[in-house]
């Protein structure tokens, strides 16, 4: 985790497919929940190779502004930057562009977890459901 430092940057691309869209009676456009998922996954992918074995990140905070529509079939690009590291908390700034303009801005936080510890905690909840 010592390799996770502010200033780490990356880019991800996605072609907007029907499953990323909503219509609301008009043309199919990139929907906000898909923009959130794209931002989260892109930030995860940026830092995942730098984590220790047995670690993973989970999203904890998302603040997003969806600024403009993007039609189905157009590519979108996420430009991510890790802007803050506070122990296990990672804060990112993400800008989302389509082929013509800035379409979204996101502030996102992820938390580095130990997979085994998180799994134990989850198993306790699953066991409690079975009672």
Regions found by a protein language model. Give the residues of each.
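C-terminal output/interaction extensions
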Residues: 109-131
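Conserved N-terminal beta-strand and adjoining loop/helix that marks the start
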Residues: 32-36
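Hydrophobic beta-sheet segments that form the core/acyl-binding groove
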Residues: 64-99
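Catalytic strand-loop segment that frames the active site of acyl-thioester-processing enzymes
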Residues: 1-31
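A structural microfeature
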Residues: 104-106
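Short beta-strand edge segments in extracellular beta-sheet folds
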Residues: 15, 97, 109-113
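Hydrophobic beta-strand-centered segment that forms part of the acyl-chain substrate-binding groove
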Residues: 45-77
């Amino acid at each position: 985790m010592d390799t996770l430092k502010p200033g780490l940057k990356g880019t991800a691309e996605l072609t907007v497919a029907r499953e990323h869209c909503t219509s609301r009676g008009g043309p199919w456009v990139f929907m906000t929940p898909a923009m959130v998922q794209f931002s989260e996954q892109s930030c995860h992918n940026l830092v995942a190779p730098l984590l220790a074995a047995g670690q993973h990140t989970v999203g904890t905070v998302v603040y997003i502004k969806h600024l403009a529509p993007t039609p189905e079939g157009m590519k979108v690009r996420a430009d991510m930057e890790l802007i803050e590291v506070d122990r296990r908390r990672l804060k990112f700034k993400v800008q989302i562009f389509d082929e013509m303009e800035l379409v979204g801005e996101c502030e996102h936080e992820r938390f580095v977890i130990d997979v085994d510890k998180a799994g134990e905690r989850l198993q306790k909840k699953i066991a409690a459901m079975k009672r």
